[in-house]
Swiss-Prot record:
This is Protein LMBR1L. Residues 43-60, 134-153, 216-294, 364-386, 451-483 are cytoplasmic. The keyword Transmembrane helix applies. It comes from Xenopus laevis. Residues 1-21, 82-112, 175-194, 316-342, 408-429 are extracellular. The gene is lmbr1l. The lineage of its organism: Eukaryota, Metazoa, Chordata, Craniata, Vertebrata. It comes from the Eukaryota.
Length: 483
């Protein structure tokens, strides 16, 4: 009887493992397909349609690696929201037959896979893809893809030895454990997590710089996508003037007599493109319904303001909790705690707000990253992004997204504890570092918003009432906006 029970238990464990493998494979296949579609929208087709078959093959292999990395990035973004939603589902319907596949073992497996694939992409795939696209083969060797593979492998091996040597020296300096200094064989259990801990710390610091700036930029980006209300504006007259100006500049560019005149054709082309863009915006506003013109934009601004205010408020409350209770410190857990208790005081509603805030912070960090002067050159262009820039974008997004769970837990956006190796980072136990990080985020976010709304709100009100057409007002607003 005991033998039969033991066999049934082992069969159940095996079936659960197979089910988890199938679910993880389906999820990753979906993310890989979506990532491939996104990258093909931005890649430069000339890199893949070249006459040189060897270069085209190299670019295809690099494209597959970039697609894998981008899929891991999307998975890292979805990791914490999926875990929070799964916990609430298990709390609501714990014994439902159709959600038996959703359990703590699956969630832990997803966290471990994201951690593993993030290490694989950052340490091996992306460096290999970049070196592979730049390789030409050793001097005197036979030309071909394999020659590039050999050169890339040798260079990557030397680079890996250099990086792990630096990691070993850093761990010997900052770690008091003497066994850690003496052992180089414990690569998987110690040095890879230590290296990823440093990368995660860099990603969290990058989020600290990009997210507050992105929170203020979100208002401008949303305003460019929506139709803004204009209370005292004659739209038809404005459209007519823009059309006349566009026709006049087009005539100057296309006329045969322009070659005899001292005209800056490049400046005229730029001016024409700006006027055409402005005309398209005006036509979109004319086609918009009154509800869309006068209601959608204010509601969107209020929603962004509410999300930003809630985020800053949660961070301020988290600072107070850090000073009072040690339980507010981010930590990792190894046991399965899913479906036991809600990680929000407000239950399912609070969990939904947490998920929305996590996605909002990630979107703000991406907007802030591509809007910053340091990284604006990485901004991809549709159908015109070279492979090296695609690799840089994939690495940047992976660093930001893999740091998102730690970032959200550090700021107190959620109380969902970090699972797997994400909770093993040594710097998460440093109280002063966590406290300073929260205070800096709250201060930077508040400073960016105050600076944004000081002149932006005034300028929007003046434009809404049509006062920007006054010459003095235009000069004053523009000079203040540039300052």
């Amino acid at each position: 009887m005991e033998v039969n029970q033991d066999v049934s238990v082992r069969e159940q464990i095996f079936h659960d493992w197979v089910r988890e493998c199938i679910i993880c494979s389906l999820l990753f296949s979906t993310l890989y397909l979506l990532s491939y579609i996104v990258i093909t929208k931005f890649k430069k087709h000339a890199d893949f349609a070249t006459v040189d078959v060897e270069d085209a093959a190299v670019n295809r292999i690099a494209l597959w690696m970039c697609t894998f990395t981008l899929a891991v990035s999307v998975g890292a973004v979805l990791l914490l929201p999926f875990s929070i939603i799964s916990n609430e589902v298990l709390l609501s319907v714990p014994h439902n037959y159709y959600i038996q596949w959703l359990n703590g073992s699956l969630i832990h497996g997803l966290w471990n896979l994201v951690f593993l694939f993030s290490n694989l992409s950052l340490v091996f795939l992306m460096p290999f893809a970049y070196l592979f696209t730049e390789a030409e083969g050793f001097a005197g060797s036979k030309k071909g893809v394999m020659s590039r593979v050999y050169e890339t492998t040798v260079v990557l091996l030397l680079l890996t030895l250099l990086v792990f040597g630096i990691v070993w020296v850093a761990s010997a300096i900052f770690d008091d454990d003497s066994a850690g200094r003496e052992s180089l064989y414990d690569l998987w259990e110690y040095y890879l997590p230590y290296l990823y801990s440093g990368i995660s710390l860099f990603g969290v610091l990058l989020l600290l710089l990009c997210t507050p700036f992105g929170l203020s930029r979100m208002f401008s980006v949303t305003g460019n996508l929506l139709v803004k209300p204009r209370l005292l504006e004659n739209l038809e007259e404005h459209l007519s003037c823009t059309a006349f100006e566009e026709a006049a500049i087009s005539r100057k560019i296309s006329t045969k007599a322009s070659c005899w005149l001292n005209l800056n054709m490049e400046a005229l082309q730029k001016r024409l493109l700006a006027i055409q863009s402005h005309r398209i915006t005006l036509e979109m506003r004319r086609r918009a319904s009154p509800w869309q013109r006068n209601l959608v934009y204010p509601l969107a601004m209020l929603l962004l303001l509410a999300l930003t205010g809630i985020t800053v408020l949660i961070v301020c409350v988290n600072v107070l909790e850090l000073l009072i209770d040690e339980a507010a410190m981010p930590k990792g857990i190894q046991g399965s705690q899913l479906g036991k208790v809600s990680f929000s005081v407000f239950g399912s509603f609070g969990a939904a707000v947490q998920v929305i805030l996590i996605f909002y912070l990630m979107a703000s960090s991406v907007v802030g990253f591509y809007s910053s002067p340091l990284f604006i050159q990485l901004l991809p262009q549709k159908q015109n992004t070279p492979m090296t820039k695609i690799i840089g974008n994939c690495v940047s997004l992976l660093i930001l997204s893999s740091a998102l769970p730690v970032f959200s837990r550090t700021l107190g956006i959620t109380r969902f504890d970090l699972l797997g190796d994400f909770g093993r980072f040594n710097w998460l136990g440093n109280f002063y570092l966590i406290l300073l990080y929260n205070m800096m985020f709250a201060g930077l976010a508040t400073l960016c918003l105050v600076k944004k709304f000081t002149w932006a709100v005034q300028a929007e009100l003046i434009r809404a009432f049509g006062l920007d057409r006054l010459p003095l007002s235009v000069k004053k607003i523009r000079s203040q906006g540039k300052a």
